[in-house]
Amino acid sequence: MLTPRQKTLALLTLCLAFLTPFPARAAAPVQPHNPVVFIHGYNADPGVWGGLREDMRAAGYADSELFSWGYDTHRSVNEVVAGQLGAYVDQVRRQTGAAKVDIVAHSLGSLVGRWYVKFGGGTATVDHWVSLAGPNHGTSTAWACALWDQACRDMTPGSYVVKNLNAGDETPGAVKYATFWSNCDEVVNPDDSVPLAGATNTPVGCIKHNDLLGDDATSAGVRAFLAS
């Protein structure tokens, strides 16, 4: 039987146990994302990605994970621009310490990204590749400027670039591929030039070529795909 002194000590011990705060549960570590390299289209600039970048920041991406690349849209896709993209991807990987990047491209930028992935070593450095309204099998509207512009020639159906990108496997390596295309695209003709064999191909409805850049449903689809 406990003495009055022992009862008092036991009660004090019990009270102290309840008053002592439990150690705080450690917050779950934030999982970093792959750096995302955005590639704009013909006659455009990196500023076109403002809306999608804002959506991605709201979804948890840090500014340090988002990279809008600029390039001369009149140069040769395969001879000049794809190599410049490869150098930029290497720079991003060194800067972030990431093994791989994700690529999100619009229009002409899709051909640049594809050439880098297929012929420039990108199958080892790219995790996800996304094309918004890319002329992946060429577009007849490019004939309007093909006479004086190399990038326009590269976008024409049956061009050296288009033919080689689509020879054999259109989606090579372990890269995850996705395209988003509109049946009202006034730039890419025919509309079904965008989808690729082996990719996740998403129709977005009747949206103009440049409007895909600010379309909420397209943005949500891109973010969901990058998270897959």
Where are these regions (language model features)?
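Acidic-and-aromatic substrate-binding clefts and catalytic sites of carbohydrate-active enzymes
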Residues: 43-47, 74-79
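C-terminal catalytic-base region of ester-bond hydrolases, centering on the histidine
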Residues: 170-228
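Bacterial N-terminal signal peptides
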Residues: 10-20
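Sec/Tat signal peptide C-region and signal peptidase I cleavage site
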Residues: 22-26
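Bacterial N-terminal signal peptides that target proteins for export
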Residues: 2-11
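Serine-dependent carboxylesterase/thioesterase catalytic core
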Residues: 37-40, 61-63, 68-69, 78-168
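Short, conserved loop/helix-junction motifs that constitute active-site signature segments
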Residues: 30-31, 121-125, 168-174, 195-197
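Short, surface-exposed "cap/lid" segments of acyl-processing enzymes
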Residues: 29-68
